[in-house]
């Protein structure tokens, strides 16, 4: 009798243990993803059966306070190859200290490559990150509540994750657009600012975009060609972004609701935003900038072109044989910041765009830094080591586009275990990946102090 009771008791314990393990597995096991966050104790990770997409349990990140938290997986990739990462994202009460750079997003760890972050409370939406592997043979693909330069709190759910390999467009034909933001109607620091582009503003922006296209083709010795268009946006822009260096400006997230349909349809390689942020009576606070570059709209180069507050008394953007024969300089300068960033990310070493004085190039009255830009684009700057400047490969280093995935190949990414052997195998694999990640310099460049695995 005692043996029977003992066996029954043991069976009950075994069933309870299996039930507990099943609960823990179903709620907290993240397959073969690795979890990482900056501030331990402020983030919870779990599988949420109450929030499903396509019948699949979602992966939930909950930041109770501002944090940068994610789960990621390292995959092997081909060098200099396009990859498309997609997933469905849902958010609840997401707030960010830097909304332009942090929120719910897909990102590549160790880089600034990430999707435009999502804040607030939103229903399921498809998010896509197009990325160039450049010189890397591995990528750490992460799903994030936070960002490379900011922190977020709230909840984010991720589901239906896919990774595809494409075929790169290796032409040097660039498709450039300037969106003319006809109206700003934004509340800044409690004050409502309303400005509109004048017809003269629009004419100057259009003329300088045309001049820009001809100039960069010439400066590159026709190593690149440029097609271009201007698109007027009638709907008012109602939000602006801020940072301590530049004060207020137009970030990708601010303008995305107004231009994204055009961007997706036309596959631009660079985006200019033409805008007026002041007049002779008042101005939105800006820190003297007239152009801002080195930004991205997803993977596309993104620049601001601001019209002078007092255009009547300004020579800016106006061709004049006596005063200014290089009015397109701001367009050229901001575009070159994108090329500079692209080439730097490929691992090349060359002068910074603002290093002109170090190499003996001075700003000229009528032509600005025209000679510097020309020699910069032709890799014709004299240095102690010989000629330097932009390597010609930069003209074929264009943003990844959806058309690069016409013949996409799906990559096995989200490994769902089917039995206990698969589970144990994934746990061992996770442990090895954690040990490898801790010694990986790219990951160490991020500021994660906590890496955990189930």
Role assignments for model-derived ranges:
Residues 23-170:
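Extracellular and organelle-lumenal recognition/adhesion modules and their flexible linkers in secreted
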Residues 15-25:
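Hydrophobic alpha-helical membrane-insertion segments, chiefly the h-region
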Residues 168-269, 277-289, 318-322:
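Propeptide-to-catalytic entry region of secreted or membrane-anchored zinc metalloproteases
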Residues 1-14:
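N-terminal Sec-pathway targeting helices
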Residues 329-344:
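Active-site recognition of the HExxH zinc-binding catalytic motif
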Residues 306-332:
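Short pre-active-site segment immediately N-terminal to the catalytic Zn-binding motif
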Residues 278-306:
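Catalytic zinc-binding patch centered on the HExxH motif and its immediate surroundings
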């Amino acid at each position: 009798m005692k043996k029977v009771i003992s066996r029954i008791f043991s069976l009950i314990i075994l069933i309870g243990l299996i039930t507990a393990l099943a609960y823990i597995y179903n709620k907290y096991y993240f397959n073969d993803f690795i979890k990482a966050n900056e501030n331990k104790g402020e983030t919870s990770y779990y599988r949420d059966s109450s929030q499903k997409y396509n019948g699949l349990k979602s992966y939930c990140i909950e930041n109770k306070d501002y944090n940068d938290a994610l789960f990621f997986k390292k995959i092997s990739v081909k060098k200099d190859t396009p990859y498309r990462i997609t997933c469905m994202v849902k958010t609840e009460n997401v707030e960010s200290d830097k909304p332009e750079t942090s929120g719910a997003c897909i990102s590549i760890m160790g880089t600034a490559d990430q999707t435009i972050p999502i804040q607030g409370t939103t229903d399921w939406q498809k998010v896509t990150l197009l990325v160039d592997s450049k010189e890397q043979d591995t990528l750490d693909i992460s799903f994030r509540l936070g960002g490379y330069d900011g922190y977020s709190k709230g909840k984010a759910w991720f589901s239906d994750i896919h990774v595809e390999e494409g075929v790169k467009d290796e032409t040097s034909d660039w498709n450039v657009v300037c969106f003319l933001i006809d109206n700003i109607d934004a509340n800044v620091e409690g004050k409502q600012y309303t400005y509109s582009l004048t017809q003269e503003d629009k004419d100057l922006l259009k003329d300088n975009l045309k001049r820009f296209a001809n100039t960069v083709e010439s400066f590159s010795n026709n190593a690149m060609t440029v097609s271009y268009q201007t698109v007027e946006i009638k709907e008012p822009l109602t939000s602006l972004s801020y940072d301590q260096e530049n004060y207020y400006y137009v970030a990708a997230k601010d303008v995305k609701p107004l231009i994204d349909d055009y961007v997706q349809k036309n596959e631009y390689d660079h985006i200019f935003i033409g805008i007026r942020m002041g007049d002779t009576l008042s101005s939105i606070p800006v820190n003297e900038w007239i152009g801002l570059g080195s930004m991205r709209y997803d993977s596309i180069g993104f620049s601001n072109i601001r019209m002078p507050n007092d255009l009547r008394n300004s020579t800016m953007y106006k061709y004049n044989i006596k005063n200014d024969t290089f009015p397109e300089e701001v367009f050229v300068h901001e575009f070159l910041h994108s090329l500079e960033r692209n080439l730097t990310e490929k691992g090349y070493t060359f002068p910074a765009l603002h290093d002109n004085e170090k190499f003996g190039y001075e700003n000229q009255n009528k032509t600005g830094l025209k000679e510097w830009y020309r020699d910069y684009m032709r890799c014709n700057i004299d240095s102690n080591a010989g000629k330097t400047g932009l390597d010609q490969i930069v003209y074929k280093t264009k943003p990844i586009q959806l058309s690069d995935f016409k013949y996409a190949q799906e990559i096995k990414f989200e490994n769902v275990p089917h039995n206990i052997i698969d589970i144990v195998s994934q746990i061992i694999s996770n442990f090895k990946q954690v040990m490898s990640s801790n010694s990986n310099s790219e990951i160490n460049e991020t500021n994660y102090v906590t890496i955990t695995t189930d």
